[in-house]
Amino acid sequence: MKANILKLLFLFCSVIVLSACDTDDDLPSSKVPETVKSAFDAKFPTVNRVEWEKKSGYYVAEFHENGVEMQTWFDADAVWCMTETDLRTDLNGLPGLVQNAFQTGEYADWRVDDIDKYERPAGVFYLIEIEKNGQKDRDLFYDENGNLLKDVVDTEKDTVLPNISFN
């Protein structure tokens, strides 16, 4: 009996600690500037359900469009900065040039953990997160033409900011 109570107490404390570790700053819609909400509505007029967060000074809308999980980022002046689309692990969601570059590249035998498409005013890029037993997970960034822009060890920090540079 005492062991069960201790297990429940441990579980309760774990839930409290883990929920306190959430680094996202959820934002009620009432705290999002009207200009940002209007910019979102203009860009995504068919989306009804939106959850807002504030990340690194950006207003981030999380939503689903046509069953696909997406995030879009606006700055404080309501200027659209980036949209992230979750392609899950389906290489077929990638342009042919990107698919081919990955499948014929150095990491072709690694397992794809996640794929995201990023659209910015400066253009589109793709992030393929990969893993392989005994190796550190990697993040591969490709442009639309299949050029590998960046190959880095995955830091477990899943946030790609709109101002990411490939230099």
Model-derived features: positions:
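Bacterial N-terminal signal peptides that target proteins for export
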Residues: 1-9
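First exposed extracellular module after export/assembly in secreted or surface-exposed proteins
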Residues: 29-167
